[in-house]
Amino acid sequence: MTSEAAPASTAVTYKRVMLKISGEALMGDQGYGLHPPTVQRIAREVQAVHRLGVEICMVIGGGNIFRGLQGSAQGMERTTADYMGMLATVMNALAMQAALESLGIFTRVISAIPMDQVCEPYIRRRAVRHLEKKRVCIFAAGTGNPYFTTDTAATLRANEMACQAIFKGTKVDGVYDKDPRKFADAKRYETVSYDECLQKHLGVMDASAIALARDNDLPIIVFSLDEPGGFCGILRGEGTYTRVQG
């Protein structure tokens, strides 16, 4: 396996980033599960950024397989439902690892819940070393605790890994004052503050994740994962997105 990176002279906005995507992003047009061509397409987007020399962390949700809140709403104990959701994120992480490694990118799946035969346990210093060696680190199983979302896990790991920004890949090209898929007059923000996101319930991330980013001055870049080259373009200073900051 080879792992190509761009020359050090390549101009990029950030040197180490966290990419957060939902589990639903992996299911394509299906209503459930994994759509291998979609997983491969996202992996190629990550590959393009990796070639710039950027160190990449990832967190992937599990909603395409199981969502803890939905299980809880249907009568399942919340803690059990959340653990099931965490296991779903491990499945998605392994699928993404396979896709990235098929493109020649060394990748490590790092789980907050130990499962040594499947992936590595989370050890912060080891994970940092993987990044320094230009390996993609996919953090799975959330924080390892129920009642915390993968958005919060992504923000926590981004801070622990000293990422310079969180990139939140979504279905739309930024943060809007209302759903642009339903309202033609929806306005996209170029920048928006953490507090405004919380006060107006703009749906960027859950409140705990936004507060954790705010308290550590960690910007959140919201962009469309469906836009070819969008992730790479933003790191080159191009593209359409919303920046959430103080």
UniProtKB/Swiss-Prot annotation:
Question: What top-level branch of life does the organism fall under?
Answer: Bacteria
Q: Which GO terms describe its molecular function?
A: ATP binding; UMP kinase activity
Q: Which reaction(s) does the protein catalyse, per the Swiss-Prot or TrEMBL entry?
A: UMP + ATP = UDP + ADP
UniProt subcellular location: Cytoplasm
Coiled-coil residues: none
Q: In which pathway does it act?
A: Pyrimidine metabolism; CTP biosynthesis via de novo pathway; UDP from UMP (UMPK route): step 1/1
Which GO terms fall under biological process for this protein? 'de novo' CTP biosynthetic process; UDP biosynthetic process
Entry's EC annotation = 2.7.4.22
Entries under InterPro entries matching the protein: AceGlu_kinase-like_sf, Asp/Glu/Uridylate_kinase, Uridylate_kinase, Uridylate_kinase_bac
Enzyme class, UniProt record, top EC level:
transferase
UniProt keywords (A-Z) are:
Allosteric enzyme, ATP-binding, Cytoplasm, Kinase, Nucleotide-binding, Pyrimidine biosynthesis, Transferase
Which residues does the annotation say bind UMP? 62, 82, 143-150
Give the record's free-text account of how this protein's activity is regulated.
Allosterically activated by GTP. Inhibited by UTP.
> Where does this protein chiefly localize?
cytoplasm
State the GO CC annotations: cytoplasm
Protein residues bound to ATP = 20-23, 63, 67, 170, 176, 179
* Region of interest: Involved in allosteric activation by GTP: 28-33
Family according to the record: Belongs to the UMP kinase family.
The record describes the protein's role as: Catalyzes the reversible phosphorylation of UMP to UDP.
Known partners and oligomeric status? Homohexamer.
User: Can you name this protein?
Assistant: Uridylate kinase
Per the UniProt record, the source organism is: Cereibacter sphaeroides (strain ATCC 17029 / ATH 2.4.9) (Rhodobacter sphaeroides)
**Gene name tied to this protein:** pyrH
